[in-house]
């Protein structure tokens, strides 16, 4: 009889962390490891620090949909190796 339980220390498919890619408009890609239930604000702030950007200057999107700081990867149904796009906020209009 085979024992179906995973051995201690061996990673399983249902681990608590996922790896996410954050793609900038300039083609750069940064990778982050984050817990599935951690608010994305942690990832957003870390990305801004790495890139020297203000969080007020950029917007984060998944599959074209805006995300905010309170969302978690689990809420957005993000999977391992999914990509979050970063766009610079554009201000414009008629003078």
Swiss-Prot record:
GO CC annotations, alphabetized: nucleus
Subunit composition and interactions: Interacts with SAE2. Covalently attached to a number of proteins.
Entries under InterPro entries matching the protein: Rad60/SUMO-like_dom (IPR022617), Ubiquitin-like_dom (IPR000626), Ubiquitin-like_domsf (IPR029071)
Organism: Sus scrofa (Pig)
Family: Belongs to the ubiquitin family. SUMO subfamily.
Residue intervals of the Ubiquitin-like domain: 17-95
Keywords, in A-Z order: Isopeptide bond, Ubl conjugation pathway
Record protein name field: Small ubiquitin-related modifier 4
GO molecular function: protein tag activity; ubiquitin-like protein ligase binding
């Amino acid at each position: 009889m085979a024992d179906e339980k995973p051995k201690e220390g061996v990673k399983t498919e249902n681990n608590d962390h996922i790896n996410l890619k954050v793609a900038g408009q300039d083609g750069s890609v940064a990778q982050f490891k984050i817990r599935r239930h951690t608010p994305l604000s942690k990832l957003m702030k870390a990305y801004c620090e790495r890139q020297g950007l203000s969080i007020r200057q950029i917007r984060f999107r998944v599959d074209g949909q805006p995300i905010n700081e309170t969302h978690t990867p689990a809420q957005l149904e993000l999977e391992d190796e999914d990509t979050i796009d970063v766009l610079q906020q554009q201000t414009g209009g008629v003078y």
